[in-house]
Amino acid sequence: MISTTDYPTVETTTTAEELYAEYISAPASSMSPAAIAEHLQQNQITFEIPSAHDLRHIDALNSFNALLQRIGNAAVSYDPAPPSGWSPDGSISTEQLSKSVVLDLADLRDRSEESGESSWWSQIFGDADMHVIINYLWIGVVSSLVILSLVFILFSCYFYRKFRTWKKCNKDIRAQIHAASDSYSSHLVGCDASRLLLHQQMQHPHHRSSEAGFYQIESPPCYTIATGLPSYDEALHHQPRHFAYGMKFVYPSLAAVHHHHHCISNWEKQEPLNKLQKCKLSAAAAVEEDKADSSSSTSASASPSSSESSNLATATPAICINMPSGRQDEEVDNSDSDSAIAVAVAVAQSLQPAAPADDDCASLVVVVAA
């Protein structure tokens, strides 16, 4: 609001007519100029000029007042028993609207302030201290983390126990299958496999029965990382089918160079049966020519030519190569796998230090241990 004076507004109960009459009745001689000025200052009338914003606000209130009057009159006209305090003709007066809660601006302002103070924060926590609230929040967060950690640990222990049970069960089943059919071996550490073995014995005593029993073992749990991956023994079992061209898996393998005196001693024992000496003469062409001459000559000259060829053979140095016979190769090819493994283990236990580079008896031996 715009004010025309800086003096404070003085509230008085006297009207303008009374002040004017008092001023006229007082004689001019009885009042000094200071008293007259003080009297005028005390009885000064001030007024305020409304601004454009105030005028728009007043117009809006008048429009809203008229709207409420129309709505109220329409509602009261349909009500046969109007409430007390209404006019006899059933219309809403301006005084009633001014006294209502809707147009009481002071009441609306107080309500807005109260609603601002009574927010959702104050409704939930009330007058609690902020430090106490933060402490409670931290306690809740830590408690939730502890509970989640305990649940995770319990589930981890449960799944690990199930995995160990499955592993132990498969180990016992594979051990019993290996003892029954000697087809599979396991490197895993009870589980009752009597029903599985009984079902296996009722089938045909063939290699396929042990294979079927092997594949009836419980599969890995779905929560392990080994799902879908074959075991080492299973991979070795299927190896000949997928790699039928001589590819072979050996585990573990040991390669060492050692002295050959053990093999030489065994070789010398069976020398008359397992060895064949083949000698080649350096002058083979001359021998063939002598044989051709001896065949074309007479029987009289046969003895001198034969003696001459024998003398040539004795005069020429022979190169002899020791080679194993074909019988030994057949025996090695037809030997049993168990005896070969036993011999390999025996040779592995009797390994000697490596022979020097110029040793003719040194050989490379690859030992395969099951």
Curated annotation (Swiss-Prot):
Changing residue 230 to A: Abolishes interaction with Nedd4, ubiquitination and internalization. Pfam families: Comm (PF15957). Residues 158-370 are cytoplasmic. The keyword Membrane applies. A motif (PY-motif 2) lies at residues 229-232. Ubiquitinated by Nedd4; which promotes endocytosis of the comm/robo complex and comm proteasomal degradation. Not ubiquitinated by Nedd4. Belongs to the commissureless family. Interacts (probably via PY-motifs) with Nedd4 (via WW2 domain). Interacts with Robo. This is Protein commissureless 1. It comes from Drosophila melanogaster (Fruit fly).
